[in-house]
């Protein structure tokens, strides 16, 4: 196993950090699509739509074309959700990481390195709703460096930071399609606190849910 070191973010890390963040966000799109394809409701909609078009036109070509169009629209809708999230973050806290995370005692951003190459990232800042709870966000590890406990070390770094700063808990959110992330957080010791349905247009067909986790820090 490679020697992994965790250190605080520097401005010279920006391009690599941004790449890991965007790639880590985009890679969930196939899982979201597959999750949608497994839902009976989705197949019901497809069958009804194609059957209706065939009954109106008696054309197999138009029916198949409508099937392809529906799949394309569904994929594009999911793409817009993930792309929109990444773009929004790049306009907000990820636009200037130094200013967003490194200028306060209670916020921080870390990178994981192997042989001086940045292979993982994570950030932490207090929750707006509860200033005694720290929010873990933007955890991402390069694909070719997984299964080396890098995610675990980054999570533990945030927990240690929270404990040193006197926070009562570390909170985070993930999605039901992120199986690896869920296993990681639960292995570290995070407990599920809430499951919510996000209010985006296609969610009634995708069964996409947001899972909130909490790690209580013992005093």
From Swiss-Prot:
* Taxonomic lineage: Eukaryota, Metazoa, Chordata, Craniata, Vertebrata
Expression by tissue, per the entry, reads: At the beginning of gastrulation, expressed in deep cells of the presumptive mesoderm. At later gastrulation stages, expressed at the interface between already involuted and preinvoluted mesoderm. At late neurula and tailbud stages, expressed in the deep mass of cells lying ventrally and laterally to the closed blastopore.
Q: Which UniProt keywords apply?
A: Acyltransferase, Developmental protein, Gastrulation, Golgi apparatus, Membrane, Transferase, Transmembrane, Transmembrane helix
**EC numbers for this chain:** 2.3.1.-
Span of domain N-acetyltransferase = 62-218
Known role = Plays a role in regulation of gastrulation, possibly by controlled reduction of cell adhesion which is necessary for optimal cell motility.
Q: Which domain of life is it from?
A: Eukaryota
Which one Pfam family would you cite for this protein? Answer: Acetyltransf_1
Membrane-crossing ranges are 42-62, 64-84
What's any one GO cellular component for it?
Answer: Golgi membrane
How this chain sits in the membrane, per its record, is: Multi-pass membrane protein
Q: Which GO terms describe its molecular function?
A: N-acetyltransferase activity
Under which main EC class is this enzyme filed? transferase
- Gene label: cml
Matching entries from SUPFAM superfamilies are given as: Acyl-CoA N-acyltransferases (Nat)
Protein name (record): Probable N-acetyltransferase camello
Compartments in which it is found: Golgi apparatus membrane
